[in-house]
A protein has these predicted regions:
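Acidic catalytic loop of the alpha/beta-hydrolase fold
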Residues: 339-343, 462-465
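Structural motif
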Residues: 317-334, 340-344, 380-390
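Secretory targeting and sorting signals
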Residues: 1-35, 213
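Gly/Pro-rich cap/lid or specificity-loop segments adjacent to the active site
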Residues: 36-330, 394-521
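Charge-rich, solvent-exposed alpha-helical interaction surfaces
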Residues: 304-307, 334, 352, 367
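Flexible "cap/lid" loop of the alpha/beta hydrolase fold
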Residues: 257-275, 350-354, 361-381
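Long, K/E/R/D-enriched contiguous segments that form extended
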Residues: 372-375, 384-387, 399-401, 408
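A general alpha-helix detector
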Residues: 280-281, 330-335, 348-352
Length: 521
């Protein structure tokens, strides 16, 4: 996934602060106990102590919570260095009908699965699934309540503690001076994260997180894994299927990330996805936003947006005395964020754009502030500071090789500008920090998962962040892969795409019922 704040998204939640406080207490007091037998077949002897652990569950609000210990470096599991990962469970109400655990990842990378589960107790899942599975999630290594976690110190250039203020970067640095400043700022951001994370950055990649997922499977007592991943969670699930194909029971990947794409291809794919979504918004603004739509037609709406971008690039849009003025990057963040859930956001976006065009950007500034600390998402007050922005940077840079020199980024910038305008160029600029990042070992590749059972990929035709074409590609890369198409807008489908999607996914998860070749909702 691209790493700007606007690109991290999990499903909307209404979170209870008391439940989160209880979660924090449970993490601090939880422990693990050994079991006399390992549930994993073929486990290397040096990993047996991790696979043999049993989770010591404690009450935490309406959930049960525990901690899982995994090796920091799977190549050297006996060196004494570990990650301790928070785990949470919403137990099925009917233990007699229980199939096992359903583990899920809400996206990111960088989203706390524990906070996400605390927000609704697993209610996003269909009733048929909740009746047959314990719903389980966890904070991946380096994320959220993980000990240790990714942290970025303040860059030497004076940026913020989360690795820099990307709202001040030019969306498309075109002059030599702008490009030099952008590249220098990205290098400072990378150096700040290396300094603040104290040596853990080489160990927070998706392949290692997938190995943690297998340790969690064993600790839960499940012989095989039942899993659902949204957005980045599809990368985690794909990696698990490649490493442990015969330990998969059922795998749902919703909002697919295509592992065969390199960094520039992925940036271009996402840029095009947002461009299409914004064009769709311009075309249907009046239908969804009614009188709040500030333009009479698609071209007028596009012209209004382009005019605001140009104005904000020259001088931030005035938001009054009680808010920061809105520069071009902040405007872009607000617009793209609204593409994730049109049914919830397009009305507010339309009102904010109309008021900004009339000289008052206060509502835009308020939406930007909400995006920084959105009510009902994994960025929730009441627990230790989460590190989603830092983690999305760390995982994304480690997972995909990037060039060290600047020229390839400027070449990609030109191609993205032609294909997707500001939405493409911003995606490329987001990649700059990876130029100075510790190198990982992953390379773009098609899925290699011989022996995995049929995997269900869910794709949304109007998905801005994980375009539908990537779902088609990923489904085709799995042996026996199945594609369920949701003909709709917004990011991901299960939990927001209606009863048709829910029935198909639930039937697959519970009964492993396949979907037909042309399945669509």
């Amino acid at each position: 996934m691209s790493r700007a704040t606007r690109r991290i998204r999990v499903r909307a939640r209404l979170t209870a602060a008391l439940a989160l406080a209880a979660l924090t207490t449970a993490w601090l007091t939880g422990c693990t106990a050994s079991s006399p037998a390992s549930p994993a077949n073929g486990t290397k002897p040096e990993l047996e102590r991790f696979y043999d652990q049993r989770l010591a569950w404690k009450d935490c609000g309406d959930l049960r919570c525990a901690r899982l210990t995994v090796p920091r470096d799977y190549a050297h599991p006996d060196n004494g260095e570990t990650f301790v990962l928070p785990v949470a469970k919403a137990a099925t109400a009917d233990p007699g009908e229980r199939i096992g655990s359903l583990v899920y990842n809400p996206g990111g990378p960088g989203a706390s699965g524990v906070s996400d589960l605390a927000a609704d107790g697993g209610e996003v899942f269909g009733a048929a699934v909740r009746a047959r599975f314990d719903i389980v999630s966890f904070d991946p290594r380096g994320v959220g309540g993980s000990e240790p976690a990714v942290r970025c110190a303040e860059p030497d250039d004076g940026g913020g503690g989360d690795g820099g203020d990307d709202a001040q970067e030019p969306i498309a640095p075109r002059t030599a001076g702008d490009r030099s400043r952008a590249f220098a700022g990205a290098r400072a951001e990378a150096a700040a994260c290396v300094k603040g994370s104290r040596g853990i950055l080489p160990h927070v990649g998706t392949d290692d997180a997938a190995r943690d997922l297998d340790v969690l499977r064993a600790a839960l007592g499940d012989r095989k894994l039942t899993y659902l991943g949204w957005s980045y969670g599809t990368s985690l699930g794909t990696s698990y299927a490649e490493q442990f194909p015969r330990r998969v029971r059922a795998l749902v990947l919703d909002g697919a990330v295509d592992p065969s794409l390199g960094w520039s291809e992925r940036a271009l794919s996402q840029g095009k996805g947002f461009r299409r979504a914004v064009d769709d918004y311009a075309e249907h603004c009046a239908d969804l936003a009614g009188d709040a739509c500030p333009a009479d037609g698609p071209q007028e709406m596009s012209d209004l947006l382009d005019g605001l971008y140009e104005e904000a690039a020259r001088q931030p849009l005035p938001a009054g005395d009680d808010a920061y003025d809105v520069d071009a990057r902040t405007l872009l963040d607000v617009v793209t964020d609204a593409m994730y859930s049109p049914e919830d956001s397009w009305g507010d976006l339309s009102e904010a754009l109309g008021e900004a065009a009339d000289g008052d950007a206060a509502k835009l500034a308020g939406m930007a502030a909400d995006d920084e600390e959105p009510a009902g998402s994994h960025r929730t007050r009441g627990r230790a500071r989460e590190n989603d922005d830092e983690a999305i940077l760390a995982v994304s840079c480690l997972d995909t090789p990037h060039p060290r020199e600047a020229r390839p980024y400027w070449d990609a910038l030109a191609a993205a500008d032609r294909a997707a305008g500001v939405y493409g160029t911003s995606s490329v600029v987001d990649e700059l920090t990876c130029a100075d990042w510790p190198a990982g070992t992953r390379r773009p590749h098609e899925v290699r998962a011989k022996g995995v059972p049929p995997v269900l990929v869910v794709g949304t035709t109007g998905d801005p962040a994980t375009p539908y074409e990537e779902a088609e590609s990923l489904a085709g890369q799995f042996p026996g892969g199945m594609l369920l198409t949701y003909e709709g807008r917004g990011h991901t489908a299960y939990g927001r795409g209606g009863s048709c999607v829910t029935r198909a996914v639930d039937a697959y998860l519970v009964d492993r019922r396949p979907v037909r070749a042309d399945a669509a909702c």
